[in-house]
A protein has these predicted regions:
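PLP-dependent amino-acid enzyme catalytic core
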Residues: 1-147
Length: 147
């Protein structure tokens, strides 16, 4: 793990990594900051070639250092839609097919990471205000983690 600190997305105020936080004192999300030079030492073409595909392949650029909570997240394809592009006067149109993720939504990636971090910090209950894909992803990953 190459996390150096967390940073308020509005003010830039620094927060200690490795602790549970909610929002910043300004009420804004906290961004994870990394030592990219340290990550580059182990994140090489050779090291990536031997890893299983998916988001956890990039572990040096993720804020966890234990076993991930996973439902088998795959690398999802970027698909060209030339007919739609031509119809709409665009030179090209690309879409990312996130429906192939375990819960059918891009929300799976974020919630996989959130539940992984919650488990790492010893959290045993999680709730979030949602009536959509995020709730389904949280339920699935929470169940996998035993939370």
């Amino acid at each position: 793990m190459n996390v150096t600190h967390l940073e308020c997305s509005l003010t830039g105020e620094r927060y200690e990594a490795g602790k549970i936080h909610n929002l910043s004192r300004a009420g804004k999300p906290l961004l994870v900051r990394y030592d990219l030079e340290a990550a580059a030492k182990t994140l090489t073409r050779d090291s990536l070639a031997g890893r299983q595909a998916g988001m956890w392949k990039w572990r040096e650029l993720l804020p966890h250092d234990g076993d991930p909570v996973s439902l088998g997240e795959a690398e999802t394809p970027i698909v060209g839609l030339p007919n739609v592009a031509a119809r709409d006067g665009a030179s090209s149109l690309l879409v990312k097919d996130e429906g192939r993720l375990p819960t059918g939504s891009f929300k799976a990636r974020g919630l996989a990471m959130a539940v992984t971090m919650a488990r790492q910090f010893g959290v045993d209950r999680i709730a979030m205000p949602t009536n959509g894909n995020a709730g389904a992803a949280l339920a699935a990953y929470g169940a996998r983690a035993g939370i």
